[in-house]
Amino acid sequence: MIPNRSGRLACSGQLTCSGIRRVRILGLAALACWLPLLGCGRSGDRADRSGTGVTRLAVIPKGTSHEFWKSVHYGAVQAADEIGDVEIIWRGPVVESDTGSQIEVVKNMITRGVDGIILAPNQKGGLVDAVDEAITEGIPVVIFDSGLDEGPEIVSYVATDNYRGGQMAAEQMARAIGEKGEVILLRYLPGSESTEQREEGFLAGLSEYPEITVVSSDQYAGDNATSAKEKVDQLLQIHGDSLAGIFAVCEPNANGTLEALRNAGLTGQVKLIAFDPSDALIEALRDGDCSGIVLQDPVQMGYQSVKTMMAALNGEPTEPFVSTGEYVATPENMDEPRIRELLQPKLKD
C-alpha cells in the first residue's frame, strides 16, 4: 500500500486493485498504531484457547441470506483448509439490518473464547462497543467488507475500495446514457459504511459529467428486493417519463430495481447499473436489461481475512488495509474468464 498525492492509500497492483483513491474505515489515521498491537500480545505462537490444537475463528457477516456472504464463507473455509487446524465458526444475522442480533453474535463469540473474530459490521457505529469488548478480552479483530467507526485497534481492514467502485458505476452509467440525462441513486441503509462509500463515489463520479442530473439521491431501499421494488415503483411514478438511469448500490436493491423496471416496461429505456451480481442480474446483463454490474471478489475477501488473522496470531506482519479489488462487468466483457468467475463466484453450501 502506498499513499497517493491526496494522502489516501493507493494500491500498486493492477489485477487486485484498480487504484485506491479513497479508503474509509474512519479510523484510518490510526492505522500506524495497529501493527505493534497485532496478535494482542500473542507474538510468535498461534492462539489456541480451546486447548485442542485447533485455532477457532468466528467469521461474522452482515447477514446470511444473500449469495455474496456464501462466497465469503467459501473463501474463509478455503483459507482455513490450506492452513490446517483452523476451524471457521460462521454465524450472523439472517437479515443485514439486524444490528442487535449481530452484536449478540459477537458477544457470544467472546463468551466462547474464540481465538479471533472476523467481522463485517452492518452498522459502522453500532458494533464499536462490541469490538472494543473483544479486544479488551484479548481477542484480535479483523474487519472486512464494511468499515467501522474510529476507536477499536483492529488488526486489519479487508475490503473492496467501495468509493472507487461507486466512481466506476458512475463512469459506466455515463457511457450507457451517452453522458447526459436524469438518473437516480438508490441508497441502501443509513450507517452501512460500504454502501455509503459507493454512494459518495457515484455522486463524485457523476460530477464530471455536467449534462447528467441526479434527480433523486435521498431514498433508501432497505435490505431486500421487495422493499427496493416498492421504492423504485414510487420513484418511477415521479420520474419515469424522463429517467435515463438508476444505480442500485447492492444486490437486493438491484434485484428489486430490475423487477420494477420490467413491470413498468422500462428495461432498456432506463439503464440499470448494479453493484454485486445475482442470477437475475447476470441474465439481464446478457439480455441488455442491465448495462453494467460493479463486481467485488467475495471469495478473496473471506480468504484474505482468514490469512490476515492467522498471520497476526502467529506474530507475522500484516497490512492495515487489504484490497480485494473492484471490476465492472458489461454485456461486452461478461464472458471473459476473470469477469465470468466474479459474476458467479463459488458458494459455501
PLM-predicted stretches and their roles:
Residues 16, 22-23, 31, 73, ...:
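Short linear sequence elements within intrinsically disordered, low-complexity coil regions
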Residues 2-27:
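Bacterial N-terminal signal peptides that target proteins for export
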Residues 26-37:
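Bacterial N-terminal signal peptides
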